[in-house]
């Protein structure tokens, strides 16, 4: 097949493109090469020469229409992710581009084998918790006043008792930030229009994806990037809150395995799938993995800072995708080792950490507990 990969010069998109080429498919990439992922408007050197590359915006109707007419399937990875309060841009890039994609498919009566849309674990927000008294709970975003007082764990909204984190299934949709809201909107556009108009669609809710090619320039996202850059430079990273917040890390090669599976397996059509690591890992545990990779005995600092809007815990339930035969095979240590090796060949690292830290503080993302 000839397959269009939007955002194909990025992290997940480029790895997926590589695998598709290895499987004998032809790959067409559409990417705007915009910051913070890319700098200088130049395609990254890791792109394979076999790909047919177009620099352009996925919202460019004429360009997108011309490309869609020539392909048999689509992976839609192009997205906007940041912590800036650009609410309209989140929806415009993530939701409107997806609506345009389906509009063209329907108008042109294109018979595509598959459209795979990249969603995010952020669509689930804090996810699902269990209270021994009141049962399942879906807490909202933690109030600023609570975080400023240094209270991290979420009490039951009904009885104020303790809550236990649960693995969150796909039926839960409770986004708490503009990015998560836009990804849920994207899911709804893709899955519902796909069902209505007979477009074989799959939406993939990725957890925190780790591995080589994750941009070093994104100030907000990427625990692997942040911690590896610190220890590589002999600096000590910061853990927010108490370092015990749980995250769900998945290796990019496992993600690619899942992406290829849903292209090939018709049982995936019309569904949303969580794509996660399946194992809860605290931020403190993850930074210890990075410490071991760099042979450091200097633990991260815990200075009583937090990022307003962060979830306390989140773990995706990957049962649904596992029923199709997929399971994550790589560990966080595998991801860290691969990323650390990749960093050795990156030359543009001077000032990256300082710029990112300054940006986070100037925007008020990082805040201190009240004394």
Annotate the PLM regions:
Residues 160-177, 199-216, 226-250, 274-276:
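A conserved pocket-lining segment of Rossmann-fold NAD(P)-dependent short-chain dehydrogenase/reductase
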Residues 105-109, 194, 231, 239, ...:
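Hydrophobic pocket-lining residues that define ligand/cofactor binding sites across diverse proteins
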Residues 39-42, 126-131, 214-218, 286-288, ...:
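Short aromatic-enriched loop/helix-cap "lid" or pocket-rim segments at secondary-structure transitions
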Residues 1-206:
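N-terminal Rossmann-like NAD(P)+-binding domain of SDR-like oxidoreductases, especially those catalyzing
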Residues 233-371:
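C-terminal substrate-binding subdomain of Rossmann-fold SDR/epimerase-dehydratase oxidoreductases
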Residues 59, 85, 93-96, 170, ...:
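Residue-level signal for the nucleotide or nucleotide-sugar donor/cofactor binding architecture
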Residues 98-99, 184-191, 224-228, 257, ...:
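Conserved active-site helix of classical SDR/Rossmann-fold NAD(P)-dependent CH-OH oxidoreductases
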Residues 66-70, 104, 230, 258, ...:
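CheY-like receiver
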């Amino acid at each position: 097949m000839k397959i269009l990969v939007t955002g194909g010069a990025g992290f997940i998109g480029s790895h997926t493109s590589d695998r598709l080429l290895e499987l004998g498919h032809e790959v067409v990439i559409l990417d705007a090469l915009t910051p913070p992922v890319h700098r200088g408007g130049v395609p990254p050197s890791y792109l394979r020469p076999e790909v047919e590359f177009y620099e352009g915006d996925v919202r460019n109707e004429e360009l997108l229409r011309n490309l869609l007419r020539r392909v048999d399937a689509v992976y839609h990875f192009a997205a906007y992710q940041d912590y800036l309060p650009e609410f309209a841009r989140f929806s415009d890039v993530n939701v409107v581009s997806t609506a345009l994609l389906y509009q063209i498919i329907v108008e042109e009566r294109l018979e595509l084998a598959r459209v795979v849309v990249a969603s995010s674990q952020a669509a689930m927000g804090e996810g699902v918790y269990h209270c021994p008294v009141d049962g399942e709970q879906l807490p909202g975003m933690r109030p600023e006043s609570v975080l400023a007082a240094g209270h991290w764990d979420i009490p039951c909204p009904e009885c104020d008792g303790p809550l236990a984190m649960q693995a969150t299934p796909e039926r839960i949709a409770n986004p708490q930030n503009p990015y998560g809201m836009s990804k849920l909107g994207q899911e709804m556009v893709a899955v519902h229009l796909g069902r209505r108009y007979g477009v074989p669609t799959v939406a993939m809710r990725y957890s925190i994806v780790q591995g080589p090619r994750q941009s070093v320039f994104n100030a907000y996202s990427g625990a692997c990037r942040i911690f590896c850059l610190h220890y590589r430079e002999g600096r000590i990273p910061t853990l927010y809150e108490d370092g015990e917040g749980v995250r769900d890390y998945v290796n990019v090669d496992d993600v690619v395995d899942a992406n290829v599976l849903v292209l090939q397996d018709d049982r995936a059509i019309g569904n949303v799938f969580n794509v996660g690591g399946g194992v809860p890992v605290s931020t403190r545990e993850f930074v210890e993995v990075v410490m071991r990779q760099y042979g450091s005995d200097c633990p991260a600092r815990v200075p009583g800072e937090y990022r307003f809007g962060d979830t306390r815990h989140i773990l995706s339930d990957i049962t649904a995708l596992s029923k199709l035969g997929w399971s994550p095979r790589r560990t966080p240590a595998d991801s860290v080792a691969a990323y650390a090796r990749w960093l050795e060949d990156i030359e543009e690292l001077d000032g990256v950490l300082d710029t990112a830290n300054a940006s986070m503080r100037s925007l008020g993302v990082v805040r201190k507990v009240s004394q």
